[in-house]
Amino acid sequence: MYKPKIICLLLGMLSGLVFAPTFFIPALLTLSYLCYIVQKSENWQEAAKFGYLFGFGHFLSGIYWISIGVSVYIADFWWAIPFALFGLPIVLAFFISASCTLSFFAKNNKYYQFIFCICWVLFEWVRSWIFTGLPWNLIGYAFSFSDILIQTLSIIGIYGLSFIVIYISTSAYPLFRKQFTQLKILLASSVLILSVIVIYGAVRLSNNPTNFTDIKVRLVQPSIPQTEKWNEEEFWHNLMLHINLSENSEPTDLIIWSEAALIVPDDIPQVKSELLQMLNSTNAILITGGISDNKKQGDEFELYSAMYALDKNDHKLFEYHKSHLVPFGEYMPLKKILPFKKLTHGLIDYKEGDGGLVYLEKYNLKIKPLICYESIFPDFVRTNNEIVDVIINITNDAWYGKSSGPYQHFHISRSRAVENGLPMIRVANNGISAIVDPFGRTIEKLNLNEINYTQGLIPKKLNSPTIFSQFGNFTILLLIVFILLINYLLALILDN
């Protein structure tokens, strides 16, 4: 039995390549083997082992880049690198193992493959919220290389798209069992479903050109290395780099800086002077990431990762506090038990903010703010576009260098635009900054490691809410019924 276990591990590693930036889509067929070997297992323990080994390989190759972030401060956190590289895949593999274990109990069911797909998506959903959640690289994101293929997000969301991807990916599993009638049914249904997705996406995009508001926005990407970002000696150089990229002879309404672009309070006299001079010369409003230090009692402070807006009259127009914090990065879970400090700068943990929406009165602009990885949580972001005009997502992917991480983060984030029918303005210190329309199309873009700015008009939101934004994950139930009906009809046709 060692051979199937090794195969599962290797195929799991190959399957991690289906995501950005490689998008090696043929690797999705590795899931057909997993589906087969789980059904072939002699007991649930064996099925769990196969699923675990596949899952470990899957996450090892898919999110290896997290260890690069830990290595930024290698002198302090060298010990954490193996935990980041291997520890997270060791934990996350349990979700795939659990889905395989549950599927095993349906091994003799006529609809085993269908149940396998349901179990996979079920545990993707569980992964999105348990232990604060990490819905990174859900299998549906394998289709995010194509604007056409992600249009169904507006109806079924990312978990629905995951179901379709896993269904298509496991359609070849009867080949291993030489069950050719079932193979014909699954392949035919997969081709039909994929055709529906392609036709729907193509028609939706061709019938809906991007419409724009009158609000011009400038995205500033300084690409400051993480080793220099919190260096006090580099502070003024970094600030002036932001300002120089922001100032331009072309008029703009909004200037947007990235997560934690201001690492000191904006009311420090010299900092304030430089900011106001820039805002007066551009006649724009600055939306920036920063650190909010609210005094609690005496000398005790509460730190928040914030997004706020400043105008040329030194008025703070709104302030948003990040509510979905990164464990181990922005705070230490189980701090009384674990004798470690968080991996990011500073000794004080960030506090969880209230989240919510903000409003920019001058432009009558209702904003859904997202800081960093808040954008990876579909249920957290899900918003009726009748009460929101635009998503503004600020982030800092400089931690992860030229790895897969920043590319994956961008494609995950833009999926939220399609789900909610809202444009997204995404600004990274380093990473991928972009203006994205409500169909997920990239209008303007700055690439990884690019030191520059780009600007354009904010796209208009859709005229009506998307089905997903109104009903959420309940639409997956309709999808399941739809695919079951297709299978039933194809079985009637192909069996005769």
UniProtKB/Swiss-Prot annotation:
Top-level lineage group: Bacteria
UniProt-listed Enzyme Commission number(s): 2.3.1.269
Topology term for the membrane: Multi-pass membrane protein
Residue positions of the active site: E259 (proton acceptor), K322, C372 (nucleophile)
Organism: Rickettsia felis (strain ATCC VR-1525 / URRWXCal2)
Pfam families: CN_hydrolase, LNT_N
Residues passing through the membrane, by range: 6-26, 50-70, 77-97, 114-134, 148-168, 183-203, 474-494
Predominant location: membrane
Family of this protein: Belongs to the CN hydrolase family. Apolipoprotein N-acyltransferase subfamily.
Residue ranges of domain CN hydrolase in the record: 220-464
Protein's job: Catalyzes the phospholipid dependent N-acylation of the N-terminal cysteine of apolipoprotein, the last step in lipoprotein maturation.
GO CC terms: plasma membrane
Pathway: Protein modification; lipoprotein biosynthesis (N-acyl transfer)
Protein's UniProt name: Apolipoprotein N-acyltransferase
Gene Ontology terms describing biological process: lipoprotein biosynthetic process
Compartments it resides in: Cell inner membrane
Keyword set, alphabetical order: Acyltransferase, Cell inner membrane, Cell membrane, Membrane, Transferase, Transmembrane, Transmembrane helix
Lineage: Bacteria, Pseudomonadati, Pseudomonadota, Alphaproteobacteria, Rickettsiales
Enzyme class: transferase
UniProt-recorded Gene Ontology molecular function terms: N-acyltransferase activity
CDD domains: ALP_N-acyl_transferase
